Every structure is written in C-alpha cells, then in structure tokens.
Amino acid sequence: MTTKDETNGEAFERGRRLREEMFGPAGMKSLDNADDFQMPLQDAVTRICFGEVWSRPGLSPKLRSMLTIAILAGQSRPDQLQNHIKGAIGNGVSKEEIREILLHAMLYVGLPAASDSWRHATAALKEIGAY
C-alpha cells in the first residue's frame, strides 16, 4: 500500500515482485519487453494495479483473483481473463473454484459472455497443466 512517504519506485518494485509471484516469467514479458510507447501502460499496471491496490491488506490475493475473474468474465476480456486465470492458480484458487465463479457470473453477465469466458478459462488451465 502506498503511504504518503513512499516513492513511486517502491510501489513499482513491490508491484513487479507481485506480478512475478502471480504470473511467473511468462507474465513478466510485457513489462520486460516494453518500449517507450508501451512503458506508461506497464508502469501503471505494475505500480498502481499491483504495487498499490493488489498489495493492500484488506483482501487476500486469492480473493482478489476470484473477484478479478468474475469482473473480467462480465467484461468479455479474454486475454486478461486467461492471464488472471493463470495468476489465480498461483494465488491458490482451484479449478473447481474457477468453475463455480464462472457459473455464478453466468447468472449476471449472460450466457454469451459466460460461454466465451468458460472457453478461455479452459484454454488457460490447459496451458498451465491445471485442467
């Protein structure tokens, strides 16, 4: 969590560590390969998303992953959903819990979005050997 006295660099480094813990080396490619055009986005994702918000003490990483899966399913964001499915496994979310999240989300996001999300979740789980 960013405090008044903390520098942006500290939040960035904390976010970098958390990204690597969640997604492993494959999840670091977009940051490590960012050029001048892409770096502002990667800085925001790393520093704000992971260094400031994901690292707050109010929710566990597992619960944050579960919430993120449900939100991304509702937004029909397949690339982000696949990335966060993989990160969720690293945060202790089981395949069965992911199935239940998608089933529950289906009631609120609709069948087309749920069907796409289920397909992308299956692909992500298979890719990391968690299916």
Language-model segments: residues:
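Short amphipathic alpha-helical surface patches that mediate protein-protein
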Residues: K86, L103-L107, T122
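Mid-chain, well-packed structural core segment of small domains
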Residues: M66, A73-R99
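A glycine-rich phosphate/pyrophosphate-binding beta-strand-loop-alpha-helix module
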Residues: E96-E100, D116-R119
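Short alpha-helical scaffolding segments that buttress acidic/His motifs in well-ordered protein cores
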Residues: V45-C49, M66-I71, I101-M106
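Acidic, glycine/proline-rich low-complexity segments that act as flexible tails and inter-domain linkers
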Residues: M1-P61, G90, D116-Y131
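Short hydrophobic interaction/assembly module
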Residues: S55-G74
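Substrate/cofactor-recognition hotspot
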Residues: L111-P112
